[in-house]
Amino acid sequence: MKTFQITRPDETIREALTDKINNLTKPKGSLGTLEELALQIGLIQQTLTPELRHPQNIIFAADHGIVDEGVSLSPKEITWQQISNFLHGGAGVNFLCRQHGFELKIVDAGVDYDLPYEKGIINMKVRKSSRNYLYEAAMTEEEMNLCIERGAEVVRQCHAEGCNVLSLGEMGIGNTSSSSMWMTCFTHIPLELCVGAGSGLDNAGVHHKYNVLQQALDHYQGDGSAHDLIRYFGGLEMVMAIGAMLQAAELKMIILVDGFIMTNCILAASQLYPEVLHYAIFGHQGDEAGHKLVLDAMGAKPLLNLGLRLGEGTGAICSYPIIDSAIRMINEMDNFAHAAITKYF
């Protein structure tokens, strides 16, 4: 598997960043999370004047073999149909990208359909759909490695275009099931607490989904390593997102983490490279059952709670103005000395 050089941001500059933030014309700590974000981004970028450049949202798309077991309300053709909607600018993620100045990239990681690549979709297809992990591993070792490498390749291109802040989204009917499997495997939270309605299952549907996933977990006979669990239960788009996250961290980019699926992707990525979490900002707590639990297990503080459960990167993009405010705070606020204000704390 491709290896990455991911290190914790150098702490040498922390004191200078903290002093700058504390000497802005406000009571110490009074801008709360904005101050925390400015400090985190300053550490990532190793500067007292951090900046956000050319924000991009990458949607990785793929189909899932486990959908054959009736774990999703939506049929798998919704995956390619929604990609068509992205191309025509009519999806939720499209208006948010337009509103907040994000470039949108759509990546075919493993959609079970012949997509129109000439319309701008990035063709990184590893295979048409993952396999059904109720009976066998979702992907081979070679396919997993290709996903990691191709996700990293997409991010290197984003970085070459001047991007230093990256939101990651997904499109793949059945991917909440893979997310629930990773969540229970890596946090040891009982599976029943990790399984939710996904795109809209009723109580009976959720119960069936849980039973299928519990059978898959019971049948698993791998070595239990993070690498093997990612390969066995993962989605092609999710593993590609892991590669993207790891490459972004190596390049010292800011990673905006979206909802339940992307949170479990960075959870899985952190099993391989724990330092990746230093580069992550968690955009929101979504409405999918289990999202709060996995965020809490990671010690993550999401910026928003809007009851979202769409995916695509929508929650991460919604949080972007808050992050922009943190950058404007550290760069545009005056300090006590220059403003001739007595420092009163």
Swiss-Prot record:
Q: What are the boundaries of the signal sequence? A: none
- Enzyme Commission number(s) from the entry: 2.4.2.21
Q: Which UniProt keywords apply?
A: Cobalamin biosynthesis, Glycosyltransferase, Transferase
The pathway is: Nucleoside biosynthesis; alpha-ribazole biosynthesis; alpha-ribazole from 5,6-dimethylbenzimidazole: step 1/2
Q: Where are the transmembrane segments?
A: none
> InterPro entries attached here?
Nict_dMeBzImd_PRibTrfase (IPR003200), Nict_dMeBzImd_PRibTrfase_bact (IPR017846), Nict_dMeBzImd_PRibTrfase_N (IPR023195), Nict_dMeBzImd_PRibTrfase_sf (IPR036087)
Entry's Gene Ontology BP terms: cobalamin biosynthetic process
Q: In which domain of life is the source organism classified?
A: Bacteria
Report the catalytic activity: 5,6-dimethylbenzimidazole + nicotinate beta-D-ribonucleotide = alpha-ribazole 5'-phosphate + nicotinate + H(+)
Catalytic center residues = E312
Tell me, what is one Gene Ontology molecular-function annotation carried by this entry? Answer: nicotinate-nucleotide-dimethylbenzimidazole phosphoribosyltransferase activity
| Coiled-coil stretches noted in the UniProt entry, renumbered to this chain | none
**Which Pfam families does the UniProt entry name for this protein?**
DBI_PRT
EC top class, as a word: transferase
Function text: Catalyzes the synthesis of alpha-ribazole-5'-phosphate from nicotinate mononucleotide (NAMN) and 5,6-dimethylbenzimidazole (DMB).
Concerning its family, UniProt says: Belongs to the CobT family.
The name this protein goes by in its record: Nicotinate-nucleotide--dimethylbenzimidazole phosphoribosyltransferase
Q: What organism does this protein naturally occur in?
A: Bacteroides fragilis (strain YCH46)
| GN (gene name) | cobT
